[in-house]
Amino acid sequence: MSKNVSRNCLGSMEDIKKVFQRFDKNNDGKISIDELKDVIGALSPNASQEETKAMMKEFDLDGNGFIDLDEFVALFQISDQSSNNSAIRDLKEAFDLYDLDRNGRISANELHSVMKNLGEKCSIQDCQRMINKVDSDGDGCVDFEEFKKMMMINGSA
């Protein structure tokens, strides 16, 4: 796989590696179905076993039962309009995981709740500061357009 990722929704290759390493709990260089289940469970407690299996099947490009770094990177590559549309849908799905009350905006409380479920140690004040960094309309929340801009900040959309 090419190391030259022209655009991706997480930013730099280093950012993608950090996310991968966070998911790869046992540091074996691959994400197992159990590791994927833990991540999905933290983000969406009502996700079914079938949804987790379907996600693994979709992301496990070589069919070996694991998601390796190259497969993980491939998820974030955006190279043409059709994959850009897919990336926008993926971003919307990610946004929806944070938008717990489904009002189209992520509040500091929602961000804090999700971060806590992921095992992140951050205060509500930390979450408010994160929100403020990308809140371009000053409403104290992040809407989808602000979320999209934040996620694509290191790439040219």
Swiss-Prot record:
Ca(2+) 1 binds at D24, N26, D28, K30, E35. Gene3D superfamilies: EF-hand. Ca(2+) 2 binds at D60, D62, N64, E71. One of its GO terms (biological process) is regulation of flower development. Pfam families: EF-hand_7. It comes from the Eukaryota. Residues 11-46, 47-82, 86-121, 122-157 form the EF-hand domain. This is Probable calcium-binding protein CML23.
